């Protein structure tokens, strides 16, 4: 056990040295940025690599990050970035999430699992980091933008101001809830669903908006396939570091597999973003009709029965896919 811990510590030091040397090769200074982080389920581990690199860039005043727009898993990671706890996500939280998924087989979190994860985060922020709630909110408010759907209002919500740490946690849970996958229920608190796509900042702000895409063609499979995940975690983190380095080494002039300025978005990237955006709204409307309309007893019982049977069939088929292909 001690040997494994020493090896991990050695790898961490090597990675820090690697990142520091790479950042020294970047010839930019005080570049003001807003980050837009896509969702991507278990691909969040790639994002950790990117953010390790950005953290070093910020520490050397090469970039200044003002706001981070997120949805789904990226809201988790962004909270760790803003509170300087990326290592906690890499070494503990991510592995807890993967272990829960493998144990539950059909969904990621039981009620007990999700309580354990957020208790760990809370304990780290308060007891290990010594932060007060006021200090946490100061780091997060108007900097962390989280997108989710309110199905009852059939509305996409972007939240940027939080009343408490509990409010931050609840917003992340809303944004990360993929029906029947995150937890064994259709909607979080019978009302909320994954945001699917992060909010793109609007207005005439002169800051560059850097989009980090976790759902590229080379990564789409990794968002849910977890076989041999332990062997690949460090590879994915290094991949994220290298992608961010490649982007800034070329002065952001060329799109990489993950990084692209919104102002330089190509046709294919725009189509992908807005296709998923449109799909999320269609899913929102469908769930609204099912939960708040078709469930009313006065409607034709055969229509209700058909919809329920169809949903159950799709859910079971997807569970079998997860169990035999992903885990």
Regions found by a protein language model. Give the residues of each.
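Gly/Ala-rich beta-loop-alpha elbow adjacent to hydrolase catalytic centers
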Residues: 70, 74
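Patatin-like phospholipase
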Residues: 2-68, 79-327
């Amino acid at each position: 056990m001690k040997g494994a811990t020493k090896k991990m510590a050695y790898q961490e030091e090597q990675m820090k040295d690697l990142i520091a040397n790479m950042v020294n090769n970047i010839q930019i200074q005080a570049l003001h940025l807003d980050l837009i982080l896509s969702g991507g389920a278990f691909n969040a581990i790639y994002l950790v690599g990117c953010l390790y690199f950005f953290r070093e860039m910020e520490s050397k005043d090469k970039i200044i990050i003002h706001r981070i727009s997120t949805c789904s898993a990226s809201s988790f990671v962004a909270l760790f970035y803003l509170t300087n706890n990326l290592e906690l996500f890499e070494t503990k939280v991510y592995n807890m999430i993967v272990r829960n998924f493998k144990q539950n087989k059909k969904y990621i979190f039981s009620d007990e699992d999700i309580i354990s994860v957020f208790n760990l985060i809370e304990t780290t922020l308060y007891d290990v980091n010594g932060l007060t709630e006021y200090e946490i909110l100061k780091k997060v408010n108007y900097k962390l933008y989280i997108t989710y759907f309110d199905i009852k209002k059939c509305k996409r919500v972007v939240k940027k101001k939080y009343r408490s740490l509990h409010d931050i946690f609840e917003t992340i849970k809303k944004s990360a809830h993929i029906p029947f996958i995150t937890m064994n229920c259709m909607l979080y608190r019978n009302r909320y669903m994954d945001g699917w796509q992060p909010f793109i900042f609007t207005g005439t702000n002169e800051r560059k908006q850097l989009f980090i895409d976790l759902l590229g063609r080379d990564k789409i499979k990794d968002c849910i396939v977890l076989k041999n995940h332990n062997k690949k975690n460090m590879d994915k983190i290094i991949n994220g570091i290298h992608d961010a380095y490649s982007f800034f080494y070329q002065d952001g002039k060329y799109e990489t597999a993950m990084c692209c300025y919104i102002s330089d978005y190509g046709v294919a990237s725009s189509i992908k973003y807005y296709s998923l955006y449109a799909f999320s709204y269609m899913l929102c409307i469908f769930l609204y009709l099912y939960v708040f309309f078709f469930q009313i007893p006065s409607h034709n019982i055969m229509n209700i029965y058909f919809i329920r049977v169809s949903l159950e069939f799709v859910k079971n088929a997807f569970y079998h896919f997860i169990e035999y292909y992903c885990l």
